[in-house]
Amino acid sequence: MAHISQISSFLSIVLIFLALCITLFTNPTLSLPALKLNPFQDFCVADLQATPTNSGYPCKSQVTSEDFFYSGLNTPLNTSNPKGIAANPANLLTFPGLNTLGISMYNVAIAPGGYNQPHSHPGVTEAGVVIEGSVLVGFLTTNYTLYSKVIGPGDMFVIPPGLIHYEGNVGKTQCRLLTVVADDLPSEVGVPHTLLATKPAIPNEVLISAFKADSKTINMLRSKFTA
């Protein structure tokens, strides 16, 4: 009976996540910024062997069923790194069938005490569901309000377009979550690196004024980041 219960629980999580993906994909408000499909095309599987242009990759001339299926999310994840986080992406570059469809998916694992640094995805929504463990999810609004909560298996979250957010493992075992972003190849802007690892560097005077800190502190912070 316990085995049947586990299967039922997993299927429930998968169904919830599929509903989430459908919502992101079909809601014009959420997916329109990333939707680049020609209205006269059913799809445009990217030809990654071709040279991309400003409009992206051209469509493959020959398409098979295999172009619309992907197993890469199941690859084992290793969180033995300084950030304690690892992810398998299903995006335009790993799954060319997503080209122009305005969606990508990620299998994410976070070690106990690990955090995905504060970051944003300009112009697009992110949402996800926890598969295992306890995850602290938070995002900041443009009026400096923090919304956050610790969530567990089967719980979902959503990050409004472009807002700074983070995820962290606050449990005692590795956590795992599936996330979906409303872009086939979303950009990511990490807050610490954006401020401390630019080339050329932001003048110390600017950061001293922003953080109310001295030059020694700013230089110490810079030393911990590379572009």
Curated annotation (Swiss-Prot):
GO terms for molecular function: manganese ion binding. Glycans are attached at N78, N143. InterPro entries: Cupin_1, Germin, RmlC-like_jellyroll, RmlC_Cupin_sf. Residues 71-219 form the Cupin type-1 domain. Mn(2+) binds at H119, H121, E126, H165. Keywords: Apoplast, Disulfide bond, Glycoprotein, Manganese, Metal-binding, Secreted, Signal. Residues 1-26 form the signal peptide. It is found in: Secreted, Extracellular space, Apoplast. Its main location: secreted. May play a role in plant defense. Probably has no oxalate oxidase activity even if the active site is conserved. Oligomer (believed to be a pentamer but probably hexamer). Belongs to the germin family. This is Germin-like protein subfamily T member 3. It comes from Arabidopsis thaliana (Mouse-ear cress). The lineage of its organism: Eukaryota, Viridiplantae, Streptophyta, Embryophyta, Tracheophyta.
